[in-house]
From Swiss-Prot:
The lineage of its organism: Eukaryota, Discoba, Euglenozoa, Kinetoplastea, Metakinetoplastina. Keywords: Cytoplasm, Nucleus, Phosphoprotein, Repeat, Ribonucleoprotein. The keyword Ligase does not apply. Required for normal vault structure. Vaults are multi-subunit structures that may act as scaffolds for proteins involved in signal transduction. Vaults may also play a role in nucleo-cytoplasmic transport. GO terms for cellular component: cytoplasm; nucleus; ribonucleoprotein complex. This is Major vault protein. Its main location: cytoplasm. It is found in: Cytoplasm; Nucleus. MVP repeats lie at residues 54-118, 119-170, 171-223, 224-278, 280-328, 329-380, 381-433.
Length: 833
């Protein structure tokens, strides 16, 4: 500012620099200051710092003041400052800033509002410089909580770390708190760093600076069917006053508290649901807890309903809730003692077994192990099972009666070779080797007795390896194997030509049956032929006492075919082709069956080894194996067939032509006869037609006249009927109209009469009401009163006129002239007497 005269208003100030001494001083208004030549005004007058109520400001590098509050000056006259320090100033008179002082501005504002601490809130503050407050000294680093509601008065030695909100603790909840340092809490309980505890007091809880809130713990509602399993993190005494060891588990139930809040050193393991048992249920508890609270590992406890309980820690129910075993009349339980105990009056040793037969309800005891629930096995007369005695090892079969296993008996499984199992499931007990299933799995119940249906005219050999002897069963029959018996499996040749082991079978068909085979033979002139032979066979056995020789030859088909083929080859080798071709059947039959002493061919071929008999042999085909020979033979045969066929065709053609000529002659003769009959019939028809035309001509005119007369009669009759109908309709219409008019007039007359009656009744009622009204008025007013009213008018008029001095009066509008001559007397009325 360059003006020499400076006008400083009230509550304004300037800084004047003395250029000679380089000292700056402050001048406050109101004043008019004349600046000297060696002085410089550093800035225009500016307002003083004003701090309103409930506000404060921070001044940096404040000036030093004396005990009386005056500003302390240095020897040079400069204001002495506390450099690097700050000063908080509250409401008061506006003050100037001395040279060197600065106003600390936050967010562009130098004056700040005092902070209000609301309820359930606190300020976490920290001392950054030692200071003395009243009678105590506060060291740097000290922290404390300023709780609301109040106004926070700031200090330069104290900084606000954070604003802390109180945590509300609701019913059935608690606050988990941890100590940061060693201290004594507000309840007077000493705490060490890292210690945790629960604050259970309801309401708002404002933590101290030595505490850390870890969270709000929600309580668990307990009931008769719900408990809480807990585990101790460290050794401590719980809220119920019980000492707990680290790692220990226990349960809290409704008997302890309706609501449990997990403590700081407790861990929730699980919610435990109650086990409810009905009268028909029980459970087996493993590792039960004794009266001291310890588990008896390895032991079991049986509980039967009706009851409700909780499983204690360490207890398990591997099998869950089980139904009481209801043992029926045809059932039993196999039991085994696991330890020595007394069952009623009987002493049971460990390992001893016994059976309990129904009907009853059974619950296993701790000392007893349930081995098996057995039932009576119902068996038909053709059903059975294998049973083994576990004491002696004897195996037997039970057939055709219901059976219950005894204590020392078990079902014995009879295993058969896989090939036999597959044959048992085949339809007829036989199967082709090429059709065997490599992945076959038997579905037979092994303890069921092995059964096989022997077909009609078949036999099965069963071998008992314990007795070392077989038995033969003839069909139709049902075979049941004893425990030590096995089937004899037949392996037969099959196919054409025969291949060994092509067919496996459990039963031997006794025949009569047939078999076919193909063999190659060579004649004496070296012609090779392929023969297809079929032969019938059967087994000649005694059904009352079948012989074992029947099954002595395992492959009787292959043996028979080989024997027959050998005989046929030998016989054909002695014949040339032409001779064999002409007499093949006879040569083969003679070779196979042989001849008797008389030289005749025998009827059959018998194999004495197994009583196998071949009764007939048939040559189905015979053809050379060489292709050229076969073709030439076929051509010669075809040529012979053609010659025979043509001769037969010629004979047939001649016979047909002869029959055709005879048929044509008969046909022509029949045609002539038919024409004669037709002409005769035509003549008769013409005669009848002439007669018909004559009758028709005479009767047509008569019919027409009759028809016209009949039509005229019908027309006249219909017109008469129509006239009658029209007259009847007109009469009905007139009568209806007359009746309608009469009804209308009657209704109108009735309406008029009723209307008149209503009017008369209304008039009569009105007159009566008026008369009654007048009568009642007269009665109410009275006769004397009426007389007085009647006289009151004239008397009043007379008095009015007398008072006015008038004899009469007339009222008019002035527009209508009135002739008053002779009318005055009438208008005034009678004179007063």
């Amino acid at each position: 500012m360059t003006d020499s005269v400076i006008r400083i208003k009230r509550y304004h100030y300037i800084h004047i620099l003395d250029n000679n001494t380089n000292v700056t001083r402050t001048i406050s208004g109101p004043v008019v200051y004349t600046r000297k030549e060696h002085e410089t005004c550093l800035f225009d007058p500016c307002p003083c710092v004003s701090v309103p109520p409930r506000h404060y400001c921070v001044v940096k590098n404040p000036c030093v003041r004396g005990e009386a509050g005056e500003v302390v000056l240095e020897s040079s006259g400069q204001v002495k400052l506390r450099l690097g320090d700050s000063e908080i100033r509250f409401e008061g008179e506006p003050f100037p800033l001395y040279p060197g002082e600065e106003l600390d501005c936050r967010d562009g504002k130098g004056v700040q509002k005092l902070q209000l601490i609301p309820p359930n809130t606190g300020l976490h503050v920290r001392c950054v410089r030692d200071f003395k407050d009243a009678d105590r000294r506060v060291g740097a680093g000290t922290e404390w909580m300023v709780a609301g509601p109040q106004t926070y008065i700031p200090r330069v030695e104290v900084v606000v770390v954070e604003e802390v909100k109180a945590t509300v603790i609701y019913p059935n909840t608690a606050l988990l708190v941890q100590a940061n340092v060693n201290f004594t809490d507000r309840c007077g309980v000493p705490r060490v760093a890292g210690e945790k505890w629960l604050v259970r007091a309801l309401g708002a809880y404002l933590k101290s600076v030595e505490e850390t809130v870890l969270g709000l713990i929600q309580g668990t509602m307990l009931s008769d069917l719900k408990a809480l399993r807990l585990s101790a993190v460290r050794s401590f005494t719980d809220v119920y006053g019980k000492a707990r060891r680290a790692g220990e588990q226990w349960q809290v139930t409704l008997k302890d508290a309706p609501v449990h809040i997990v403590d700081a050193y407790e861990t929730k393991v699980a919610d435990v649901a109650a086990v409810s048992l009905s009268a028909k249920e029980y459970v087996i508890i493993h590792h039960p807890v004794d009266d001291t609270g310890h588990n008896r590992f390895g032991e079991t406890l049986v509980r039967r309903g009706e009851c409700t309980f909780f499983l204690q820690p360490g207890e398990t129910m591997p099998r869950g809730v089980e139904q009481v075993l209801v043992v029926g009349k045809e059932e039993a339980l196999l039991l085994e003692a696991v330890c020595e105990y007394r069952d009623g009056g009987e002493k049971r040793q460990p390992g001893s077994r016994w059976m309990v037969h129904g009907p009853l309800e059974y619950i296993p005891a701790n000392e007893v192990k349930l081995l098996e629930h057995r039932r009576m096995m119902a068996l038909d007369k053709n059903e059975g099972i294998y049973i083994m005695n576990t004491t002696t090892g004897e195996v037997r079969a039970v057939i055709g009666k219901p059976y219950m296993l005894d204590v020392n008996e078990v079902l014995w499984e009879k295993h058969l070779p896989l090939a036999v199992e597959e044959l048992l499931e085949s339809p007829n007990g036989s199967i082709q080797t090429s059709e065997r299933n490599p992945g076959f799995v038997s579905h037979r119940e092994k303890y069921r007795i092995v059964r096989f249906n022997v077909q009609h005219n078949a036999a099965v050999q069963i071998y008992d390896y314990r007795k070392k002897q077989p038995r033969i069963v003839l069909g139709p029959n049902l075979v049941m194997l004893a425990p030590h018996e096995e089937f004899t499996v037949l392996s037969l040749s099959g196919g054409t030509p025969k291949v060994p082991n092509s067919l496996q079978s459990l039963q031997l068909f006794l025949g009569p049956r047939f078999s076919s085979d193909t063999i190659v033979v060579e004649t004496s002139d070296h012609a090779r032929l392929r023969l297809r032979l079929s032969y019938n066979w059967y087994f000649d056995i005694d059904r009352a006492n079948p012989s074992r020789r029947t099954f002595s030859v395992p492959d009787f088909i292959g043996d028979c075919c080989k024997t027959i083929a050998s005989r046929v080859r030998g016989a054909v080798a002695a014949e040339d082709f032409d001779s064999f071709h002409r007499n093949s059947a006879k040569i083969i039959r003679t070779a196979v069956f042989g001849v008797d002493e008389a030289g005749e061919t025998k009827k059959n071929l018998r194999f004495t080894a197994n009583d196998f008999v071949v009764t007939n042999i048939d040559v189905q085909s015979s053809e050379p194996t060489d292709e050229k020979t076969r073709d030439s033979l076929q051509k010669s045969v075809q040529l012979a067939i053609e010659i025979t066929t043509k001769s037969q065709e010629a004979a047939a053609r001649h016979g047909n032509e002869l029959k055709d000529q005879e048929a044509k002659g008969q046909l022509e003769r029949q045609k002539l006869l038919d024409k004669i009959e037709v002409e005769n019939a035509r003549t008769k028809w013409l005669e009848l037609q002439a007669k018909s035309e004559a009758v028709q001509a005479s009767g047509q005119s008569v019919a027409e006249a009759k028809a016209r007369a009949e039509a005229l009669f019908i027309e006249v009759r219909s017109e008469m009927q129509q006239a009658e109908m029209r007259a009847k309709a007109y009469r009905i219409s007139a009568e209806a109209e007359l009746q309608k008019l009469q009804q209308r007039q009657a209704l109108e007359l009735e309406y008029t009469q009723r209307q008149n009656e209503i009017d008369v009744s209304k008039a009569r009622a009105a007159a009566e009401a008026e008369a009654e009204k007048v009568k009642r008025m007269v009665d109410c007013i009275g006769r004397d009163t009426l007389v007085a009213i009647a006289r009151a008018g004239p008397e009043t008029q007379v008095k009015l006129l007398s008072s006015l001095g008038l004899k009469g009066y007339l009222i008019t509008d002035g527009n209508s002239p009135v002739n008053l001559f002779g009318t005055a007397q009438g208008m005034i009325g009678e004179p007063k007497k």
